[in-house]
């Protein structure tokens, strides 16, 4: 307020706002409304960036033009920065957006109001940021906002091997697609084998069928991340064979395992 008088001479090129961050978010929401195509939102205590990249890769392999979060920009400033790219290029067919939180202040719910998700992917609930949220239960409640904010006709993609995540299925009356390794799920990896080259071989199972898959990444966590991506591909009409073929060409994001 004290600088407002100094800025008056620039009024023809400035917009005054009571809260610059809220105004920035509202601007991004307006750009989203003008674009109005599917949004896949991804959250979890770990693996968000890898799962987001895998999901974007799988969808792009089907010929779709995919907007994805810039770097790990997943908060109230980072998400709008990504979304505003639609103002200069609205030819994207779909957006895969990472949504994070670190405090018990409805962060994810507020992010969802900028870009309401058509598909919400919840990866896991782990004691990350527990110093701010107090308990694993509170972390789960915060992550669950991604499911609660789903569009009525949206789809929740939930990790069946994480009980805190899988219990979120009760929060959405619409479609649920589960994925997992240990527990029975809609999308699964079976007959898993790790080779000496750091690659993972498995049978990919979806409701559409089965196909042999080769993932050039190692570790159970990466299998789960690719199953989340496979579930999204299935939701958008890809065959199991198409999804498995796309996994063969993925690469880990920089500095990610």
Label the model's feature ranges.
Residues 1-2, 68-73, 243:
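A short glycine-rich beta-strand->turn/loop micro-motif centered on a GG-aromatic cluster
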Residues 12-22:
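N-terminal pre-Walker A segment at the start of P-loop NTPase domains
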């Amino acid at each position: 307020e004290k600088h407002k008088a100094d800025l008056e001479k620039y009024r023809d090129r400035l917009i005054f706002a009571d809260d610059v961050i809220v105004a920035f978010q509202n601007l991004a929401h307006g750009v989203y409304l003008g674009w109005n195509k599917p949004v896949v939102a991804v959250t979890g205590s770990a693996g968000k960036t890898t799962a987001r990249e895998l999901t974007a890769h799988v969808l792009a392999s089907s010929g779709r033009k995919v907007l994805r979060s810039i770097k790990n920009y997943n908060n109230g400033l980072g998400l709008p920065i990504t979304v505003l790219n639609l103002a200069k290029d609205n030819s994207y067919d779909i957006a895969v957006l990472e949504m994070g939180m670190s405090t018990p202040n409805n962060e994810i719910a507020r992010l969802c109001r900028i870009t309401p998700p058509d598909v919400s992917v919840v990866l896991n609930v782990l004691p990350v940021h527990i110093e701010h949220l107090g308990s694993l239960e509170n972390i789960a409640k915060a992550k669950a906002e991604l499911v609660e904010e789903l569009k009525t006709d949206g789809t929740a993609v939930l990790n069946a091997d994480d009980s805190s995540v899988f219990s979120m299925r009760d929060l959405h009356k619409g479609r649920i697609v589960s994925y997992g390794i240990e527990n029975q799920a809609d999308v699964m990896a079976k007959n898993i084998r790790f080779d000496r080259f750091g690659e993972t071989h498995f049978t990919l199972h979806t409701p559409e069928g089965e196909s042999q898959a080769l993932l050039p990444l190692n570790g159970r966590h990466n299998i789960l991340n690719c199953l989340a991506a496979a579930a999204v591909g299935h939701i958008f009409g890809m065959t199991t064979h198409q999804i498995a073929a796309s996994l063969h060409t993925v690469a880990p994001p920089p500095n990610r395992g």
